Amino acid sequence: MEVSSEQQLFFMREAVALGERGRIFAPPNPWVGCVIVKNGCIIGRGWHKGIGSPHAEVCAFQDQTSSLVGADVYVTLEPCCHFGRTPPCVDLLIKSKVSSVYIALLDPDPRVCKRGVARLKEAGISVYVGIGHEEAKASLQPYLHQRETGLPWVVMKTAASLDGQTSDRRGISQWISGEQARLDVGRLRAESQAVIVGSRTVCLDNPRLSARMPSGDLYERQPLRVVVDSRGSVPLDARVWNPDSGNVLLATTEQCSKEHIQKLEDRGVEVWKSSPQQVDLKRLLQYLAEKGCLQVLVEGGARLHSAFWREHLVNAGVIYWGPKFLGDQGSPMLRDLQLCLDNAEHVKITKTFLVGDSVKTCFECVGREDG
């Protein structure tokens, strides 16, 4: 049966949507989705549910009840061709005698890149690459970025008043955004493998940094909570050190006392030391990537956000605009960047919509105006 380009895109978008279901549990693997189509109808759906579990293609094959001979397979990422925790997906595709495989994106992993396509073509299967490319790229951007750069995809998150203040003149920020916005942050944290916060924010707000569902229950998988504290100024009774909400890492320097470090290590906190005077943020990100982090959420405050901006380490951002005005005596989102219009940081706004009584703006970083 002839399938139009519009139908092909429809099927791939369905695969992308399926892949998103695995976004929380799949990392450090990519959240891949797959649909199987025969005679113009979807007969199988699948997505990768977590490390060590069957890949999307296998799940889709297990979901169908018809013969796969002559079927078309739509998958958001190039099928693997190597043995890992699971067998190669290309072997299953070849054995099942499918007619065609539509792939949205090639896998940048050197163990797979173009090799999966080559294996399928050698077996006489028609392969088409690029259908739904933009949709799949938008979904899998953290995975693609981490594989290509060795750094996790860094998302800056902040809440601000309509005039751009992240706290009032007393330094208080709870709460600028509304309740629905705060619930939305729970999902954003769950989709990240690490959440980074600065010492001043911990001292002022005493956050748990846990990822909670709208019901108030913790997500089954919690992000690593990372506290950037060069001198060990965060008190030992801060809620962030509580192991009940997941693992914690202290990113610090030689300025932090051995006694403070030992007390935290005794509680199960991992300690990562950087350069003598201040935490090397790029090295920290490299370390988090080595631990399997694909996406990192930087929650601030302004000093930490500004440090990431100065080093051009921010890839995207989410701003929750609360329905308030605070004047100019609070804390701005960013400090001391020394930028003018002709060398300003340029971003592409990708989404803006209401979340309860707050406005959520999503953006991706493009670069500086001066190139």
From Swiss-Prot:
Q: What is the lineage of its organism?
A: Bacteria, Pseudomonadati, Chlamydiota, Chlamydiia, Chlamydiales
Query: What's this protein's name?
Result: Riboflavin biosynthesis protein RibD
Q: Where is this region: Reductase?
A: 151-371
Q: Which UniProt keywords apply?
A: Hydrolase, Metal-binding, Multifunctional enzyme, NADP, Oxidoreductase, Riboflavin biosynthesis, Zinc
Residues of the CMP/dCMP-type deaminase domain? 6-128
InterPro entries, per database record: CMP_dCMP_dom, Cytidine_deaminase-like, DHFR-like_dom_sf, Eubact_RibD, RibD_C, RibDG_C, Riboflavin_Biosynth_HTPR
EC number, as in UniProt: 3.5.4.26, 1.1.1.193
Q: Can you tell me which residues bind Zn(2+)?
A: 55, 80, 89
Its function, per the record, reads: Converts 2,5-diamino-6-(ribosylamino)-4(3h)-pyrimidinone 5'-phosphate into 5-amino-6-(ribosylamino)-2,4(1h,3h)-pyrimidinedione 5'-phosphate.
Summarize where substrate binds, as residue positions: 173, 189, 209, 212, 299
* Family listed: In the N-terminal section; belongs to the cytidine and deoxycytidylate deaminase family.
Binding residues for NADP(+): 159, 175, 201, 205, 230, 301-307
Write out the pathway annotation from the protein's UniProt entry: Cofactor biosynthesis; riboflavin biosynthesis; 5-amino-6-(D-ribitylamino)uracil from GTP: step 2/4; Cofactor biosynthesis; riboflavin biosynthesis; 5-amino-6-(D-ribitylamino)uracil from GTP: step 3/4
Database matches in Pfam families: dCMP_cyt_deam_1, RibD_C
What this protein needs as a cofactor is: Zn(2+)
User: How many cofactor units bind, and how?
Assistant: Binds 1 zinc ion.
